Design a protein with these regions (language model features):
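N-terminal Rossmann-like NAD(P)+-binding subdomain of aldehyde/semialdehyde dehydrogenases
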Residues: 1-41
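Conserved C-terminal structural/oligomerization subdomain of aldehyde/semialdehyde dehydrogenase
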Residues: 128, 165, 219, 263, ...
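ALDH superfamily catalytic-core signature
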Residues: 130, 138-280, 344
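Rossmann-like NAD(P) dinucleotide-binding subdomain of oxidoreductase/dehydrogenase enzymes
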Residues: 32, 36-174, 300
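Conserved residues at the C-terminal ends of beta-strands
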Residues: 26, 56, 115, 134, ...
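Structural detector of well-ordered beta-strand residues that form the stable sheet scaffold
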Residues: 74, 81, 110, 155, ...
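Residue-level signal for inorganic ion chemistry
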Residues: 20, 77, 109, 131, ...
Length: 385
């Protein structure tokens, strides 16, 4: 429905199964009572379900993002209702069908086929106890405002403009490989995609030359063809928005370093793979989230300057640092980068075993791991005199 290359779609389904297996194996441990020694004869912490959880989910990973929420929420004893993006209703119906096929009781997971204008009404419903939203920052703010007015718990996973810092001592062959995977997965339509490549100026030209050669190996084409690595964008409107952001960035002084070929029919949603260089703060490619196959290259005088540029963003979802000095990379990832995840010498991605969430305008709360399942439970103190 949204144009994902078929092999990437199959991988998404496998990952969705993985998160279900992960919580089936680990939820009993995560949710078991935790004894705490106090003056009482007995005291412990119990984890009880909240009730109905309302999920508002996007189109870009239409299976994974639902199961990422649903597996922990439902195994903790909650009920799920889903408002999926209108352009992936086939996925929404398929997910509901899966829950009807397995051993869950009837109606513990239902798909609401409603417009976005009805979301506030659902949030206000007294049966809804909490909300999980994955989407744009503007959508997150609107949901948080409404949920706040009725004091309901929210977990928000919003937009990102992930910086990838490349230091002069990095292995450029391995680094460019990771950077390209981080940028072009799902045709660049990912909140945790690499959006800003911040390169020490002494190696900037080498980085550009190597990554462009690797881009030439990408296959733009039919998403049903297993050879395809770059499919169409989700819509012509999304393509046109990205084109406009690229144009404004170039008009502001950035240079167009590379542009790939796309299918010749103009009435399609394909966007070329574009490499912009000499991108500066104040340009859309630096300040905004570019949701598509555009690489924005930014020059940094040195490591300290690169860190400043990386954090010069309203977003804080993921970040990566590439260096041969592993201890320094760990220090920067842990203590310097303002993000919910800091990766060293690899591209940012989610994993059921690790918490996933952002800071700043990338949202709040966590999904996945032991932390994610605790977002939608009542962490209850039990005290016996």
């Amino acid at each position: 429905e949204m144009g994902k290359p078929i092999l990437q779609g199959e991988a998404e389904v496998e990952k969705s199964a993985w998160v279900c297996d992960y919580y089936a194996d680990n939820a009993p441990k995560f949710l078991s009572n935790k004894k705490v020694k106090t003056e009482a004869s007995e005291s412990y912490i119990s984890f009880q379900p909240l009730g109905v959880i309302f999920a508002v989910m996007p189109w870009n990973f239409p299976f994974w993002q639902v199961f990422r929420f649903a597996a922990p929420a439902m195994i903790a004893g909650n009920v799920g209702v889903l408002k999926h993006s209108s352009n992936v209703q086939g996925c929404a119906d398929a997910i509901e069908g899966l829950f009807l096929e397995v051993v869950f009781p009837n109606n513990v997971f239902r798909n609401l086929t409603i417009s976005s204008s009805k979301v506030e009404e659902v949030i206000e419903n007294s049966m809804v106890k909490a909300i999980s939203l994955t989407g744009s920052t503007s959508a997150g703010k609107a949901v948080a405002k409404k949920a706040g007015s009725v004091l309901k718990k929210t977990v928000l996973e919003l937009g990102g403009s992930d910086p990838y810092i490349v230091l002069k001592d990095s292995d450029l062959e391995k680094t460019t490989e990771a950077c390209l995977k981080g940028r072009l997965l799902n045709t660049g339509q990912s909140c945790i995609a690499a959006k800003r490549f911040i390169i020490e100026e002494s190696i900037k030209s080498d980085f550009e030359n190597i990554i462009i050669e690797k881009i030439k190996d990408q296959v733009v084409g039919d998403p049903f063809d297993e050879r395809t690595t770059i499919g169409p964008m989700v819509s012509i409107e999304a393509r046109d928005q990205l084109k406009a952001q690229v144009k404004v960035t170039i008009d502001a002084g950035a240079n167009l370093l590379y542009k790939s070929i796309t299918p010749s029919n103009k009435n399609n949603a394909y966007h070329p793979v574009v490499v912009l260089t000499d991108v500066l703060p104040g340009m859309p490619a630096f300040d905004e989230e570019l949701f598509g196959p555009v690489l924005s290259i930014i020059s940094a005088k040195d490591k300290e300057h690169a860190i400043i540029l990386a954090n010069q963003s309203c977003f804080g979802l993921g970040a990566a640092i590439f260096t041969s000095d592993i201890e320094e990379g760990k220090r920067i990832a842990e203590f310097e980068l303002e993000a919910g995840a800091g990766f060293v010498n690899d591209f940012v991605r989610s994993d059921p075993r690790l918490p996933f969430g952002g800071v700043k305008e990338s949202g709040y709360g966590n999904e996945l791991s032991s932390y994610g399942i605790l977002e939608f439970v009542n962490i209850k103190t039990i005290y016996i005199r």
